[in-house]
Curated annotation (Swiss-Prot):
Annotated binding of O2, by residue: 58
Additional information: Ghost bat has two hemoglobin components in the ratio 3:2. They share identical beta-chains and differ by three replacements in the alpha chains.
Positions contributing to heme b binding: 87
Function, in words: Involved in oxygen transport from the lung to the various peripheral tissues.
Protein name: Hemoglobin subunit alpha-1/2
Record-listed Phosphotyrosine modification sites: 24
Post-translational modification N6-acetyllysine, affected residues: 16
Entry comment describing in which tissues the protein is expressed: Red blood cells.
SUPFAM superfamilies listed in its UniProt record: Globin-like
Length: 141
């Protein structure tokens, strides 16, 4: 559960991300594919090379979804319901992959916003991404 301080940290961090959410999403996907090659199996139809238009487009979807979630911290299940359905019923993504992508997102955010990435912000963003992952995997049961 996100505390009021966590919510404030997430909102402040996401305000700094701003219009770069899609770029950060694409960078995090690239990090994930390089660090955890088994994740590539969900994207057999993608050109996974650096700077690929397909990775950038999917990164934008990731960034947009996280921006939506950051704007609805009090109702993540409602904000992410359609995405939860998509990943559980159609794409059938292994839930562990959300944790891997979350880790890569944290690394990406830390690399771009080192000064603002305090231990408290890190903890809040980690809790936020874990909450998003929990919602996205909630319909797997």
């Amino acid at each position: 559960v996100l505390s009021p301080a966590d919510k404030a940290n997430v909102k402040a961090a996401w305000d700094k991300v701003g219009g770069q959410a899609g770029d950060y999403g694409a960078e995090a996907l690239e990090r994930m594919f390089l660090s955890f090659p088994t994740t590539k199996t969900y994207f057999p139809h993608f050109d996974l090379s650096h700077g690929s238009a397909q990775v950038k487009a999917h990164g934008k979807k990731v960034g947009d979804a996280l921006s939506n979630a950051a704007g609805h911290l009090d109702d993540l299940p409602g904000a992410l319901s359609a995405l939860s359905d998509l990943h559980a019923y159609k794409l059938r993504v292994d839930p562990v992959n959300f944790k891997l992508l979350s880790h890569c997102l944290l690394v990406t955010l830390a690399s771009h916003h080192a000064a603002e990435f305090t231990p408290a912000v890190h903890a809040s963003l980690d809790k936020f991404l874990a909450s998003v992952g929990t919602v996205l995997t909630s319909k797997y049961r």
